[in-house]
């Protein structure tokens, strides 16, 4: 039996404390041996908001997970050209870890979009889906999961009692509006990096 590995894909623009809480919860509650953080160079399903290059986003993730047990950075998406399709990500990781059991972290709000992902019928049955609640995500997740299970043979592992209202969008909005308090939403080393690099219109070196 191979390792139980998690895939945590995203733009991480920027990575925040909510991302870390989500990864820790998935690792601990689902008994994962390791979670691979996979920053997307070019997300296929939504435009990438401005503020940080893929190099900066990779470095922020590296800083955020430094010293975290059972977490590692993967560059399979960052290093390849074109859209970061999930099926391509999974196939590359399967080549690197041929004996692994795969678990994909998915925000609850992504359930409705999952059937529209590139080559969804091939992708969905190939891993288990750890579904993380998101505030205000609307539709009943139980019904959505039941429909996807019937249609694609999906296997879901809900983190039903997880709560976190931090999002990268919220962080960027606070930064754009010049509101104080955004630093508390991010790991300290990521805050320092943003100041050092002058990302998200923060004055460099401030």
From Swiss-Prot:
Q: Which UniProt keywords are given for this protein, alphabetically ordered?
A: ATP-binding, NAD, Nucleotide-binding, Nucleotidyltransferase, Pyridine nucleotide biosynthesis, Transferase
Record bears the keyword Nucleotide-binding: yes
Listed NCBIfam families: cyt_tran_rel, nicotinate (nicotinamide) nucleotide adenylyltransferase, PRK00071.1-3
Q: Name one GO biological process term.
A: NAD biosynthetic process
The keyword NAD is assigned to this record: yes
Pfam families per record: CTP_transf_like
Enzyme Commission no: 2.7.7.18
What is the stated purpose of this protein?
Catalyzes the reversible adenylation of nicotinate mononucleotide (NaMN) to nicotinic acid adenine dinucleotide (NaAD).
Mention one GO molecular function. nicotinate-nucleotide adenylyltransferase activity
Name of the protein in question:
Probable nicotinate-nucleotide adenylyltransferase
